[in-house]
């Protein structure tokens, strides 16, 4: 039951943007997540200081360096892994 609550909470904080080219609102960062098909998520800037989110960023740096194919920050992990990590950051 706790997992379901954390997943529902993650959906409140993690906003999936429907307009891929739209600017992120103040206080949020747009990231592209997925292995083959990328989905755009908006995450709070406060996540940048969290060690588990930094681990995802390190994975991104290893794979892409600073040249991201989507034009924004791309995190190369399965979407469910991303949601699992970020749901714990609330």
Curated annotation (Swiss-Prot):
It is a peripheral membrane protein. Coiled coil: none annotated. Induction: By auxin. Triggered by brassinosteroids, including brassinolide (BL). InterPro entries: SAUR_fam (IPR003676). Seedlings over-expressing SAUR19 display auxin-related phenotypes. These phenotypes include increased cell expansion, increased hypocotyl and leaf size, defective apical hook maintenance, altered tropic responses and increased basipetal auxin transport in hypocotyls. Interacts with and inhibits PP2C-D subfamily of type 2C phosphatases such as PP2C67/PP2C-D1, PP2C64/PP2C-D5 and PP2C46/PP2C-D6. This is Auxin-responsive protein SAUR19. The gene is SAUR19.
């Amino acid at each position: 039951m706790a997992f379901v609550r954390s997943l529902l909470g993650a959906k409140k904080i993690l906003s999936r943007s429907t307009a891929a080219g739209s600017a992120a609102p103040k206080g949020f960062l747009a990231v592209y997540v997925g292995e083959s098909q990328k989905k755009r998520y908006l995450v709070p800037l406060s996540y940048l200081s969290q060690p588990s989110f930094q681990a995802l960023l390190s994975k991104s740096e290893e794979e892409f360096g600073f040249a991201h194919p989507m034009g924004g920050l791309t995190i190369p992990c399965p979407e469910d892994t991303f949601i699992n990590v970020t749901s714990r950051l609330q």
